[in-house]
């Protein structure tokens, strides 16, 4: 969940109070930061010694740097920092507009790993279940940051929009990385949906229900390439009547990203990213 953007709302309200005859600024606004300066990373020392291994593996995989590299193609007007931190025992992640940070908690990563271990998964499925949710959550919270910093208008729940942003971004990075990350993220939502007893708070929450998020991820993936993502229907139980409309859902989401966010993408930074990774960008799975 993103922190409320009170300061942004206040600035917009104040701007409406300025007199129409106010003189124009004599200096042009400062240019946005260069790609390398747009998104920084911080690995904070974990408070719990049991999380030390998570820190070492994340650093070794350059986990935050890989995500920052992708977000860096967006010409954000202010720097953004991705932080891996301890959160007083709480498994969470959030965007803080006042500090310009996206925080991912060690406790959250530990929870993903515990869920995967308890399911006794093997091979790629085990790696995806442990790593996919972490990547997806970080991109989801970064979506809140992009919406805030670019002043992206949102029709509907911002949490749904952040899920869509993360999913479309992954799909545009490449089918392979998207398959593994989205499979892991959806698996996590499916596991939580299976064990949670729903109450009034779940239905009133800003976030969609875990089961809804599970199907939404697979629907967008399937809609982007029904042949490649056929397992969404064949193995992961996306209902056929929902699957029939997923192509349209994906293109609707892609159109929104192209209209609202793509104009802020730095084409040179994007090309450097493509050349560097040769279309096989890997999020450290």
Give the predicted meaning of each segment.
Residues 22-24:
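Bacterial signal peptide processing site
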Residues 115-136, 150-154:
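Short pre-active-site segment immediately N-terminal to the catalytic Zn-binding motif
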Residues 200-285:
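Pan-zinc metallopeptidase signature
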Residues 104, 136-151, 159, 163-167:
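Active-site recognition of the HExxH zinc-binding catalytic motif
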Residues 55-79:
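Zn2+-dependent metallopeptidase catalytic core
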Residues 157-196:
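Post-HExxH zinc-binding segment in Zn-dependent metallohydrolases
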Residues 18-20:
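C-terminal motif of bacterial Sec signal peptides marking the signal peptidase cleavage site
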Residues 84-103, 108-117:
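Catalytic zinc-binding patch centered on the HExxH motif and its immediate surroundings
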